[in-house]
Every structure is written in C-alpha cells, then in structure tokens.
C-alpha cells in the first residue's frame, strides 16, 4: 500500500479559513494511514502547540510550517527542517506581522535577503510571471525548493498537471503532491463556505468565486490520491517529510540573567535577597520551621533552574513599590515562604497552612506560575517598565485565543446565510453571550422563530460546528513572557491592538506545554481603590496606612461583615456572598478565607457547603475517617473546601506522592474540558482501601474532586484575596467616607455602580455634597462638614463629607476639570461668564455643567444656569439703546423635584435628592407594593409584592438555571430568586425591566431573606425616562 505525507494543511487557526481543529485533522490523517501531517496555517504558528499535542496523542508525525503570500510575489508553504529553520520561520512571521496592522501581515521580498537555512519551500504557482518567480525562489532556497501540485477534481486537472510538470522541468525543480487541505472531512464544506463568507463580510449567496468549487480540500484516502497524481509526486511527499526532523520539544528557553550583580550567580543572589526579606518580615527572628521551609524551597528552586524567574518577579514588585504602586502576589505562589520573604506575596505562613507542592514540585514537569495584582490604573507603568528593561525583542505579552461562543457564532452564521438584520439580532438575543450551545427550542419559540424552519435548522447546525473555534488572537490580561534570547527565536511576535504593546502568538496553555515561563501582571481595581483610600485618609487626617498596618482581627469589622453590610468591598459583595455571610458569620481571618472560597462552583457542586455550615452551626457532629485525615481536615470541620486539602487527602489516605497529588490537582482543573480524571478514581479507591478506608469514602472524595473541576479555590489564593477583603471591610467600617470616595474615583471596577455606592453611603448617614464648580475637583474629595445636617440617623462620628467630583458628569473632559481647578485656586468664580473665561470652557462644557447642577451656586438652579450659558440675557442687552421701559429680569420657573431627579440621572447617573421610588411610592402603594423596610416585618412563607430598580441580574452556572435579581428602593435592597421556568416564560420582562414588580413568597432563614418570584411585571414607564445602570449576568 502506497504511503503519503500531507504537506499543506490549514487548521482552524487560519482564522475563518480552516474548518477543522488540529485534533480532528490528526485523528483523520492517522485513520487514513498518512505518514506525517504538516500544519501550515497562514503566517502564524498560533495553533502549532495544539497540533504538537495532537501529534503526540495520535503518534503521527507533525511537520511545522506556514503558508505565506509574498507581496507582489509568489505564494509559498515553508516547512521547518531543523531548529535553525524554525527560528528563521518565527523571524519571518514576526517581521511580516509587526509591519502590518493587527490581524494582517505584509511579507516583502526583502525579508528573504538573508539566508534561511533549515527552511524548505513549496511554491504554489498562481498570479505573476512563473519563470521569474521560480528563478528568484531558486536563489532564495537553493536545493530546498519544490513546485507544489494541488489537484481537486477540477475539469482542467489533466492540463494543469502537464503544464506544471513542464514548468518544473524547465526550471529543474522537483515537484510534489499537496492537498491544500482546509478540513478533515468533506462534511465540513458548508462550514468552510460559511467561514469564507464571514471573512469577506458577504452572504454565502454573494461570495461567488471566493468559495471553493467543490468539497475536495479535505484529507483524502491515499487510494484516491493515487488516481490523481503520478506516484513519484506522492513519494516525494515522504522524502520531504523525512527531511523535516524538527520537534517543538527541542526548544530551549532561558530566563534573563542581567539581574545578578557581579560576584554572584542567580542562586546565591536569590539567597541574599531572601535573607534580607527574612530580616524585614521577621524582625525578631523567624521560627526554625520557617527557616527550614525556606531552605527547602530555595534548594528546589535552584535545582530546577528557576532562580532567575524569582529574581525577575522580585524586580517587578520592587519597581512597583518604589513607584508607590500597590501590588500583591496571589494564586499558588502564596504557598511559598520564599515568595513571602521576597515581598511578592503577603500570606504569612504563621496565618495559614501552606502546601508548597501546589506551587512547585520536583516531580511535575511544569514551571511555577506567579500572579501579581497591581492597581488597575497604573499597571501600564509596570508593563512599560518591562518593555524598557528587557527590550521589545525579549519581552511581550501572552495571547489569548478568543473563541466563538453562542451569540457571536449564531450572529456570524445568520449574517452569512443572508438573514435580515432584525432576525440576526433576535437570534443572537436568544443565546447567552458566553453560552457554548446554540439557543434552545423554547427560547427560539418565545422569540417568534419556527425551530423546524429549514433555514433556521441550517443556521443552528452550522452554529453548533462553529462554537469553540478560534476567532482571533487577543491580548492576555497580563501574562508576560521575558527571555534571555530574542523571543522570535521561540515564537512569532505580533502587534497588539493597543499601541506600544506586542503579543506572542501562544496562549497560557501553549506556554505551559513547551515550558516557557511567564509572570502574570494583572490589574485589580480594588488595589487602586485601597491605595486611593489610604491617600485620602492621609490627606484628611495626616495618618498613613498600609496593608500591613491595618489593625488585624477587628471585632467591629467582623460584626459589619456578619450583617452582610458589604456593598463595595472586595470579593464578598455579590448577592450570593451576602446571603452566605449571616449564615457563616466570619469571626476571624481564617473564617474570611473560607467565606471567600466557599461561594464557588467547586464547593457547591461538590456538595461541601451545607455540611460545612451545619457543622459550623453545631447542627451536625464533626467526623473524621482517621486521625491522619483529621490533621488535614480539622481546620474546615472535616469538609474539604480547598484544592490543597484534596491533594493532602490523596497523599495521606491513598499514598500519592506530592508530585502525583499535583497531577491530580491539574486533572481536577481540566477534566471537564479534556477528561483525564477517571484513572484517578480507581487509583484513589485502591490506595484508600489499602489504608483501611471504605469504598464509600473513596467515592465521596472522588465526587468532591469532580466538583473542584468546576472552579474550586486553592487555599493560598483565597487567603491572598481574604487579605484584601479584610482591608476593604476595615476601611468601609472605620473610614466609610474615604472608602466610598475612593471606590467612585477608581470606577469602573467592582460589582456596584457609583449610584449604588452613594446610596449605600447615604443610608449609612454619610453626607454627600453635590457637584459644584466652586468646590469640586475632577475626582470626588473629602470636605469638613460645616454644619451637622439634620437627619434621622447619625453617621459615623468624625467622618467628613464626600464631595462629588466633576468626573461624575457624563461626557465632561478631565482637561476642562483641571483648568477649573487651576482657575479656582487663583480666586473664586464670580459668575458663569467669569468661569467660562478664566477656565477657557467652550459652550459644550458649560452646558454639561449646567445640566449637572454644578453651576447652581453661580446661577441658582439648572434652568437659570442653562439660560445664562446660552447667553439669552446677554443677547437681550443688544436692544438696550432702543426706547422702552426698563426690562425686569426674566422670570424662569424653578425645576420641580421630579425634573431635578430626571436631570440628575441623565447627567450624573445618580441623585442626591429623594430616591426615585420615594417619589413613586404612592403609585406603588396603589399596586400593593411593599418597601424593602416593610419586608422586615413580614413572616416566612407570606405572599408579598415589591417593586424596585433592577441593579443586578445573575445566573451562576451552579444555580441550575436560577436567576438572582437585586432590587433597590429608597430603604435598601431586596434579593429575588427567579426559577428557570418563570425566567423562560417571562424572559423579556426579566431581562428588560428597569423598574420591576415582583409578586412572590418571602423566605427567611435566620437573617437571610429572599423573595421567591411568582410573577414579574415591568413598571419601567413610571420612571419617565430615568435610566438606572444594572450589572447583568457578570
């Protein structure tokens, strides 16, 4: 039987061209008996690591390559022969991508001026003068050029074959058979046509000759190819494949070495810095156990060759601290005492149980992964520092493969099949944005579609095939790769969408597979808010706080947390967390670690939450299968809540080594996507049986492990987050004005809008002052309270007032605000004309200020301010020389309370006047709607109706289709539970209403109250144009 190697094949990483994944292509090629498969995506190696994995999974040889079009020149397929050829291909792709806009490339003849050893070229003849092109290519690729013949059962195949063979003879070139493969099986042709139409922004019906004439560009049986090509051309494919010996496993990555001073190597310098950190962290001396652990970690770090990596992360964190940028390491790195000593993380080993193997293990072939959060508004300074320190040729961001999800896939397919725009939008609305399935029949019927329509069935079929396909490369939120050698010796580099940034073509999973190290430079809004809060406190009181100096274990802070009074704080501000807080009632830092971790899909789906709560509330006894496991589970009352505990159970009860336990952890994280967990079921059972544990216990542990596959927190990660949770709660409890001010100045971030933060602050008795050009800066600020306002409840003692900043005004520019600040420092504004002249404000800026009520001190009210800005009274003065009686000032009506309210929301997104529902309360009462305050007196199980502004909609993946809605009225919030069937029946009201009435049943459990919805009504017309921001399904 004749053999064959396919040398020209595109995967779906030739975006919107290739219609099959590498895994599908390799499985099919293996089944057809191919000897090798080249993945040659167009000017990219973005999918080559996945192809390498597919090659290893199937045992079929991978040839690395790329298809390229030379500008004003030939089209080529370049195949990698050896390491030098791979590096040359990476450099070519990098040059072509860097000189073009993101998503395109420009490959020039001059790029081939330097020798390209180790690259074999297949010439795909087409436009242009063939003899001239061929002779140029022979000079570029001497003895390494073939003429590629690609036949697809066209009417002209025989003539084309003879012409091409004649050209090859004329130039003295060998010829080879290729397939120009775009899909693994013929059945993907419809998808390939659809993707072509999507790429060209045309309906399929108008794509014409842009579509292939038939479905022959798939992996074909060798017997079929023998009927098309002379045998010599098939044999030549094997000869070329035999020359291509490169394997991605040959790549050798080196970390930068320039951080080591003279007289040291990386290991000795890391020990010096760690020793300095020990003195700083433990001024009175560290415990012997801590020193022993540090020595163990340093030995392993040096043995595995990761010293330079730790030095680099330390350098990044040190830079941030020198620039007063708040930062903190998190994730598995918080298991490392060395990271704590170096200042990378903040988890004191005396406050938590650490498992270093979760971070770094001799037995696993995986580099460490250190995540560091920085203030979200200053992270760019850190990124640019890295570019400047290492150079753009050695530093770049990691890519993220953006894939098709339900809404995007159905939208693109429906457009390509020619559906009108209104139907395209309606179909997309039937999908959840991140859904990985086409819309359900029920959702389609609700939207007025006929699920049996042939066109719709075709749309849904193609959508199902497209979901999960790569759509484009985007930028990782912060993954940064730094190398000793130029990065384009390892992987191609291209431009990011954002200027001054470059991105490698591989994502995080690719880096792990080939052993490249990255550090995550992440942005965290809460760090910005905390640093701003520290600055505000220092400016107002003269007291300087840091994360380390916040008083620990403060009873008042935990009492506030137990009441679920946590709007605006970190991690425990969602409705799910706020429902859990009164049940768990954290009393100390470790309780807070548990709180952060327990409201996650892993513990929920693993059935761990309710047993833990019952044991915590002494409704069920603590039980342990053995004294050894009691040591593992005691701190969580016998219920495994953290990944580290699962690993320790495997070690203690089933005889796993630490490295094997980490492999179990990796399998937990990936089993839903890739499987691989089942082999551990039997391994755990046998190991536990051997140590005296029952099959029932082994099954229970395995099911809990599967739950962790749905996003369970490592304890180290939860502890890192809990530090920020506690800090934000302490600030909210003891410095509420500064905290609210800092949150708004750091927005957009977090869970709540500025309006919700301000409403919460006012409910706590804080005085909020209106935006005013005579007092407001760009940012919100703190002011002394000149006169204690009369109010029903007194605010926290000693708290300043919060003055709204000009940043609150929609559309107002910061430059205008800064000029107002500078002019005001010289002297106060006399009138609007004086403001406009000295702050150099155009009419648009003055109108925005007038509409926001920021000119009331100069004009009296919004209407008068707008009148003066328009210059109406100045224009009346033009007629002053005419004989007439003296004109009295124009009498303008003052805006009503409702008009001011509407203007506030339109301009500021919030109001300091009465809450909208306070004005609507009589109308709501006529509809028998109770307030959130009234619900406090309603008994469990009673039917009740409420109405409120929708401020949040959530549908967690663990909630079996349940939607949680948060309603706000003038007194507080109401948590509403909408079961799946009601949500589907009344989806339009649920998703679209701004003012929602809910008829339902009140359920109470201790201090937790929920309204179980029975009917939903949209009362939004009562708002009369007021728009309220809602956080939906995030």
Curated annotation (Swiss-Prot):
GO terms for cellular component: cytoplasm. InterPro entries: DNA_pol3_alpha_NTPase_dom, DNA_pol3_finger, DnaE2, DnaE2/DnaE/PolC, DNAPol_HHH, NA-bd_OB_tRNA, PHP_dom, Pol/His_phosphatase_N. It catalyses: DNA(n) + a 2'-deoxyribonucleoside 5'-triphosphate = DNA(n+1) + diphosphate. Its EC number is 2.7.7.7. GO terms for molecular function: 3'-5' exonuclease activity; DNA-directed DNA polymerase activity; nucleic acid binding. Keywords: Cytoplasm, DNA damage, DNA repair, DNA replication, DNA-directed DNA polymerase, Nucleotidyltransferase, Transferase. It comes from the Bacteria. It holds the Pfam family DNA_pol3_finger. Signal peptide: none annotated. GO terms for biological process: DNA repair; DNA replication. It is found in: Cytoplasm. Belongs to the DNA polymerase type-C family. DnaE2 subfamily. DNA polymerase involved in damage-induced mutagenesis and translesion synthesis (TLS). It is not the major replicative DNA polymerase. This is Error-prone DNA polymerase. It comes from Pseudomonas fluorescens (strain ATCC BAA-477 / NRRL B-23932 / Pf-5).
